[in-house]
C-alpha cells in the first residue's frame, strides 16, 4: 500500500492525524472529527506493509525488537509527519 498519497490528502484537508487499524478503513482526523478516507477495510497485512514502507532498516529492526516505534518522516513539498506504530491484539496498528 502506498501511504504517501494519503499524506498529500492530509495536507489538502488540513488533517492532523492519519490512522490505520486492521479490519477498518484508513481514517483521518479533521478539526477533531475522525472520518474514513475510503471504504476499503484494511487487512492486518496491509496495515503492517504500510507501516514498514515508512521505516528505514534501522527503524524496522527497532520495531521488530520493541514491538512499537515513534519516528518522523519528511515528504518533500508536503512537510514532516510524526509516525507511531505499535502492536495491538497481535496486529500492527
Question: Which residues does each PLM region occupy?
Answer:
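N-terminal "pre-motor" subdomain/linker immediately upstream of P-loop NTPase catalytic cores
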Residues: 1-93
Amino acid at each position: 500500500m502506498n501511504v504517501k498519497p494519503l499524506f498529500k490528502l492530509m495536507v489538502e484537508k488540513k488533517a492532523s492525524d492519519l490512522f490505520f487499524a486492521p479490519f477498518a478503513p484508513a481514517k483521518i482526523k479533521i478539526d477533531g472529527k475522525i472520518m474514513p478516507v475510503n471504504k476499503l477495510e484494511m487487512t492486518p497485512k496491509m496495515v503492517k506493509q504500510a507501516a514498514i514502507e515508512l521505516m528505514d532498516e534501522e527503524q524496522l529492526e527497532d520495531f521488530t525488537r520493541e514491538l512499537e516505534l515513534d519516528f518522523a518522516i519528511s515528504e518533500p513539498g508536503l512537510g514532516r509527519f510524526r509516525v507511531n506504530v505499535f502492536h495491538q491484539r497481535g496486529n500492527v496498528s
